[in-house]
Amino acid sequence: AKTDPPIHCASLXRSS
């Protein structure tokens, strides 16, 4: 997750 691209951030963020 840390090494993964900033996709999780956009997804979570967006969801939140």
Curated annotation (Swiss-Prot):
Ordered alphabetically, the record's keywords are:
Glycoprotein, Glycosidase, Hydrolase
One annotated GO molecular function is:
amygdalin beta-glucosidase activity
| Domain of life according to the entry | Eukaryota
The EC designation for this entry is 3.2.1.117
Q: How is it modified after translation?
A: Glycosylated.
Is the keyword Cell division in the record? no
Reactions it catalyzes: (R)-amygdalin + H2O = (R)-prunasin + D-glucose
Q: How does it assemble?
A: Monomer.
What is the protein's given name?
Amygdalin beta-glucosidase 1
Task: Please give the organism.
Answer: Prunus serotina (Black cherry)
* Native organism taxonomy: Eukaryota, Viridiplantae, Streptophyta, Embryophyta, Tracheophyta
